[in-house]
């Protein structure tokens, strides 16, 4: 990110009165400036990063982010120092030519849900013990002192509550693993890659292991050295077509010229993650129209996660047969979801 900002500042011959630093360095000492610009400001709500508002003395502040909303609600801290003054939707950005036009194909994958349904049944049974309160259940997992206090306040047996807590967490993890790392997604991803051999493709998977299972193209992840990852990324940037596979390492701040196809094998409810991942493929380039393929296991909670995370109306929900038509260059009948549902799919 710092390198990208530096490149743009040098292009505009503004290096003389502009200093670019990463947040980790800024919070270590006192600063003074006329204008403070904070990019990816949604990250600055953490206890350490939020000290930037105290260590920097500024006259004006400009904060930028793809999506300010956080699942933990801590964006309110940022708003205290920098209230929202303008909001640009993805549709508006496309209309004004700030990003390239794109279509997101939401591929609903049908598969045997026997295992998932059993996990979901057990998950709901354990969840009901906590009154369907996610925060209570999660705090019980993370904080034994909270669990003891909660048991005392509700006249519950601590040993039983502990068992329920970890059984609930286990089912939550296994249910998520079932949908995010399903083998059928690897199969569909390979099909898309084979049909788009002339494209520059980025894939996002739930885990490093899943990224490696795709079995074609380059793999970039956090367990490799920074030097090796830089070499891999530079190699991909020089390619006219090809594939680079990742889990989370390329979600933020990566600018790859020519990237026009993205396959998302793993999603959650976060608008931030969704906006940033889609942003990799829609960086503006004249004449480019990007394709985003989001793979979802039909009949599971994953569809609700996608619905909560979506930030654009440029989507088409399709099945596997319709995907085959799209990959073959044929027209399909599009359909959109009913957004009037009041069901909470967050978890």
Tell what function each PLM region has:
Residues 33-39, 245-246, 252-268, 273-276, ...:
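A short beta-strand element within the Helicase C-terminal
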Residues 2-32:
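Inter-Walker segment of RecA-like/P-loop motor cores
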Residues 42-104:
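Post-DEXD/H (motif II) to motif III coupling segment of the RecA-like Helicase ATP-binding lobe
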Residues 148-153, 317-347:
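Long, largely alpha-helical accessory region at the distal end of helicase-like NTP-driven motors
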Residues 100-165:
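Inter-lobe connector of SF1/SF2 helicase motors
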């Amino acid at each position: 990110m710092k390198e990208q900002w530096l490149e743009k500042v040098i292009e505009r011959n503004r290096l003389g009165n502009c200093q670019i630093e990463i947040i980790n360095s800024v919070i270590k000492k006192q600063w003074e400036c006329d204008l403070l610009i904070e990019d990816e400001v949604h990250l600055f709500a953490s206890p350490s990063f939020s000290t930037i508002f105290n260590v920097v003395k500024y006259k004006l502040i400009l904060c930028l982010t793809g999506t300010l909303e956080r699942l933990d609600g801590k964006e309110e801290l940022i708003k205290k120092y920098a209230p929202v003054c303008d909001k640009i939707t993805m549709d508006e950005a496309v209309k004004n030519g700030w990003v390239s036009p794109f279509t997101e194909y939401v591929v609903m994958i049908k598969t045997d849900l026997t295992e998932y349904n059993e996990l979901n049944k057990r998950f709901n049974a354990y969840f009901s013990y906590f009154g369907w309160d996610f925060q209570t259940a999660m705090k019980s997992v993370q904080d034994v002192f909270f669990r003891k206090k909660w048991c005392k306040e509700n006249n519950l047996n601590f040993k039983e509550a502990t068992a329920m807590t970890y059984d609930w967490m286990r089912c939550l993890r296994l249910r998520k693993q079932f949908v995010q790392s399903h083998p059928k997604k690897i199969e569909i991803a390979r099909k898309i890659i084979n049909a788009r051999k002339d494209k520059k493709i980025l894939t996002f998977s739930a885990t490093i292991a899943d990224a490696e299972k795709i079995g074609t193209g380059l793999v970039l992840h956090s367990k490799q050295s920074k030097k090796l990852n830089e070499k891999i990324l530079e190699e991909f940037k020089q390619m006219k077509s090809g594939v680079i596979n990742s889990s989370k390492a390329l979600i933020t701040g990566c600018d790859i010229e020519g990237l026009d196809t993205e396959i998302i094998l793993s999603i959650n409810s976060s608008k931030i993650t969704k906006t940033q991942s889609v942003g990799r493929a829609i960086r503006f380039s004249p004449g480019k129209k990007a394709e985003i393929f989001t793979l979802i296991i039909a009949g599971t909670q994953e569809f609700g996660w996608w619905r909560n995370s979506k930030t654009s109306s440029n989507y088409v929900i399709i099945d596997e047969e319709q995907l085959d038509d799209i990959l073959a260059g044929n027209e399909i009948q599009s359909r959109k979801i009913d957004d009037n549902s009041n069901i909470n799919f967050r978890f």
